[in-house]
């Protein structure tokens, strides 16, 4: 935000007149070696970097509404290799951090705990994993392929409660670290009172409830807000960063064809009698 002659909170001073212009900046530092390695990977793919954008910020662009960014919110992007944090207030990014635990760590815990291949562990995580156990978990059985053996012949059955017992501790550790990072950030309480969860790992059952329990804050599960032309298959929380990068390119690098969906992507069709009204109800509710 800019400060012009003592007037604070100015987002864009272009066209304004004054004697003294100040600006408050948020700087993000990254490991030099890791950044150079990413540039090298892009170069080998014959791609050029237009601008670096921190992933949690991009996810915030995709998932947060303007009122949230104005009033104060912290976004938690639960990615594969890490969990990104981004706090917005007054419409601007004011704090970022990264917790070095992500969805891949949960997958590895399942693979080690159940002695199963990584692919099978990922499959079980997506279909059966839960952060909070249920009353039927001890009775519900899951087939677990064994490492290094034929999948159909070696599968053994375990109760779903065992899988929950493996997954929950890692998620608890993640949110406890998130809580510690937020508490030590020095950011105003109002900006961290509301939490928005997104990212692939946020899709695990019960994650929102566990986050609210540990962080003791209001939690909303989010997916990218509709972008015109974006397919439904790539509009989930796991694609939040990609959607945010598209919006960033549209705003900063002149891509007018990329814009938010301003109307219902599936507008109701004219009803034709009773059957038409039934079809309209099904489209609206399912």
Task: Give the predicted meaning of each segment.
Residues 30, 129-133, 190-214:
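Glycine-rich phosphate-binding loops at beta-strand->alpha-helix junctions
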Residues 214-242:
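Conserved phosphate-binding/catalytic loops in two-lobed NTP-binding clefts
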Residues 25, 71-113:
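Glycine-rich phosphate-binding loop of actin/hexokinase-like ATP-binding domains
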Residues 78, 87-89, 97-98, 146, ...:
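Active-site proximal loops enriched in glycine and acidic residues that flank catalytic Cys/His/Asp
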Residues 42, 77, 110, 178, ...:
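Residue-level signature of catalytic and energy-coupling elements of molecular machines
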Residues 108, 161, 165, 169-176, ...:
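Feature representing long, continuous alpha-helical segments
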């Amino acid at each position: 935000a800019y400060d012009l002659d003592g007037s604070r909170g100015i987002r864009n001073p272009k066209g304004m007149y004054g004697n003294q212009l100040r600006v408050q900046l948020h700087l993000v530092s990254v490991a030099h070696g890791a950044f150079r390695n990413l540039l090298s990977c892009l170069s080998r793919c014959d791609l050029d970097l237009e601008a670096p954008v921190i992933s949690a910020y991009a996810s915030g662009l995709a998932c947060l509404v303007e009122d949230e960014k104005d009033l104060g919110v912290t976004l938690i992007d639960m990615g594969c290799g890490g969990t990104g944090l981004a706090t917005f207030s007054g419409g601007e990014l004011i704090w970022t951090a990264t917790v070095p635990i992500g969805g891949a760590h949960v997958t590895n815990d399942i693979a080690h705990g159940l002695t199963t291949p990584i692919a099978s562990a990922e499959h079980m995580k997506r279909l059966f994993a839960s952060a909070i156990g249920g009353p039927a978990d001890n009775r519900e059985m899951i087939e677990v392929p064994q490492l290094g053996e034929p999948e159909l012949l070696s599968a053994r059955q375990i109760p779903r409660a065992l899988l929950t017992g493996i997954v929950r501790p890692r998620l608890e550790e993640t949110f406890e670290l998130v809580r510690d990072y937020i508490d030590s950030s020095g950011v105003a309480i109002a900006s961290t009172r509301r939490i928005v969860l997104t990212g692939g790992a946020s899709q695990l059952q019960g994650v929102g409830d566990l986050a609210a329990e540990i962080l003791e804050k209001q939690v909303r599960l989010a997916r990218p807000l509709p972008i015109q032309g974006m397919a439904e298959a790539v509009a989930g929380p796991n694609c939040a960063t990609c959607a945010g990068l598209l919006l960033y390119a549209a705003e900063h690098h002149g891509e007018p064809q990329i814009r938010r969906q301003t109307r219902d992507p599936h507008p109701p069709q004219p009803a034709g009698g009773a059957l038409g009204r039934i079809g309209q109800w099904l489209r609206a509710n399912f």
